[in-house]
Amino acid sequence: MTVQLTDDAYAVLEGRHADPFRYLGPHPEDDRVVVRALLPDATAVEAVGEHGETAILERVHDAGLFAGPLPNGSHRYQLRARFGDTTVDLEDPYRFPPILTEFDLYLLGEGTDQRLYDKLGAHPMVLEGVRGVGFVVLAPNARRVSVVGDFNFWNPRRHQMRVRGNGYWELFIPGATAGDHYKFDMTGPNGETLPQKSDPMAFAAEMRPKTASIVVDQTRLPLPRPAPDNINALGAPMSIYEVHLGSWRRKDGEQWLTYRELAEQLPAYVRDMGFTHVEFLPVSEHPFDGSWGYQPTGLFAPTSRFGTPEDFCALIDACHEHGIGVLLDWVPGHFPDDPHGLGNFDGTALYEHANPLQGRHLDWGTLIYNYGRTEVVNFLVSNALFWLERYRIDGLRVDAVASMLYLDYSRPAGGWIPNKFGGRENIEAIDFLRRFNAEVYAKFPQATTAAEESTAWPQVSRPVEFGGLGFGYKWNMGWMHDTLNYISKDPIHRKYHHGQILFGLHYAFSENFILPLSHDEVVHGKRSILGRMPGDEWQRFANLRAYYAFMFAHPGKKLMFMGSEFGQEREWNHDRSLDWHLLDTPKYAGIQALVRDLNRLYRDLPALHQLDCDPFGFEWIITEDAARNVFAWMRKGNDTRARCLVIVNFSPNVYQDYRVRVPFPGRWREVLNSDAAIYGGSNVGNAGEVRTLEGLVPELSLNIPPLAAIFLKPED
């Protein structure tokens, strides 16, 4: 047959056609149906009808364009192509119907589809009885988008996609399957060839330094069992063990543990230590180990460093089996500018701001999301819901919230653009955070969210409907800075810094606070928590024990970074395992035993957790004894007699016959003493219990151990 090449033909051949279906595939022509196929490197092609009848397709262009009539005019056919000495039967991707429905496009356009992970990305499916993978990607400014991968020898001309409404490109590729590697190859708006891009919605990715996405059949992932009910309730104990999966523990010469190996060890350890939750530093795929996961390129993909998505499910399931809630660090504030990532995705600033005064983070050299774009907000909200639904994560801790809230964050004068009212608040980011929290709590009411927010922004942990940002909790960065500064002082100077302990209680109930001793406090020359303690060896360990006891007695939920629970000496190094051998030495084992018992006490005594975020749960008893570095307070639960008296002595002196007033006469049992010999202390205390003195007002006479805290509860 004689074929006249049209503009559409040349656009397809040159890789600049927005809808190759207009030319490729079956098309009515006069009284017959003509099929056109672009098969680079094929030497001969014929069409095979559904009943086995064949018709030879003519090579009409040396680039591998073939055309000819279909046998019997049927739209159900295959292409039989010869490549050298090999003949292969292929399904023609250009004969299949669209993947996205008009309703899908409507929801995507208005930004109300919070389940983008069901539509975008790569999804194994069956169309017209044929198995393959449907690919969908947003690239509104690209002239051409192709899928390249294992299934087409990475040839960008082989599987050119078609654009649908609002810039969504799609293609069903027959024969592609789970496990295939792929990327998107694009021509930019000015005809330029762009770096091949990983799929923003990929559910798995190659191990760095490789960057291809991997097809995953989400419908076949095992769903982890749910966490215990009400594990995130405000009145429940919450003690979080923060973990970097790559350096918690290693094997065979510092090799990573896999997700499944972690599942065998980590949950049991966390439960034994008494923590209620684990919080993983970001597990989303990231190219640079040294970012600790905080510069992700694959927000929907658990990093392949430790295994597959199925393996990650096994880790979550094991945590839940042991009664441990799982929180993820989540990074919706910025992303790296690696060529395969989101930056300049379709040749334009699709996910980021085009203006570097808005779109580039000066501290980290990363790109900042443009929260003014509906597509970007929808992408991020969908990602949050994805982790909660598909992996049954129990909550998200949002990183670097302060950098999102303020347009001038870490920027010099004149180096930022004010909002429409002339202010420094990032209005679009505020709206995004409120929407994120509203969607999470509406769809997953048992989940929780927490903000790492270091400024005085009000109502971070208040509901959106009451004018807040909507988070469940806020990290108490002020408490962390003040108390670490105080405890690092020599005890003889602490009386001059007494207010650093008192000040935190002035605002302790303005938010639902988490007290964080996080990874950020044991890196970059800050030393480990133990490394900050002053004095000789005995005083250093006693200081640490007293500080941990003070933390667990203080209002607020608790968070401790791995290694701190046994007194890791050196700073954290993401390239090394924790120094578990230290536990062979009694003084480190004593720290670990204390943290285990503090967690147990915190869980078992309602007074220590029921009203963590309520001023009715706390009462100062002694605040003015700066000369002796002593503080005392009462923690309260919902029940009248749910009380716990806490006395903390931040001096190395023993105080005998120390008088403390209490609300109830009778016997008070000493339920924990951080100076106990089993923790490595000097064993000064009150022999396990003390009775109130005779008098009108109930009062205790106590022996206060040095650099220690004691906890007492009334006996019924």
Swiss-Prot record:
EC id: 2.4.1.18
UniProt keywords, alphabetically: Carbohydrate metabolism, Glycogen biosynthesis, Glycogen metabolism, Glycosyltransferase, Transferase
Disulfide bonds: none
Active site per the UniProt annotation: 399 (nucleophile), 452 (proton donor)
InterPro entries: A-amylase/branching_C, Branching_enzy, GlgB, GlgB_N, GlgB_N_E_set_prok, Glyco_hydro_13_cat_dom, Glyco_hydro_13_N, Glyco_hydro_b
Highest taxon of the lineage: Bacteria
UniProt xrefs under Pfam families: Alpha-amylase, Alpha-amylase_C, CBM_48, GlgB_N
Biological processes annotated in GO: glycogen biosynthetic process
Catalytic activity: Transfers a segment of a (1->4)-alpha-D-glucan chain to a primary hydroxy group in a similar glucan chain
Primary enzyme class: transferase
Gene3D superfamilies in the record: Glycosidases (3.20.20.80), Golgi alpha-mannosidase II (2.60.40.1180), Immunoglobulins (2.60.40.10)
Gene Ontology MF term list: 1,4-alpha-glucan branching enzyme activity; cation binding; hydrolase activity, hydrolyzing O-glycosyl compounds
Protein's UniProt keywords contain Glycosyltransferase: yes
Listed transmembrane segments: none
HAMAP family named among the record's database cross-references: GlgB
Similarity comment: family membership: Belongs to the glycosyl hydrolase 13 family. GlgB subfamily.
Summary of subunit composition and partner proteins: Monomer.
UniProt-recorded name of the protein: 1,4-alpha-glucan branching enzyme GlgB
Native source species: Rhodopseudomonas palustris (strain HaA2)
Gene: glgB
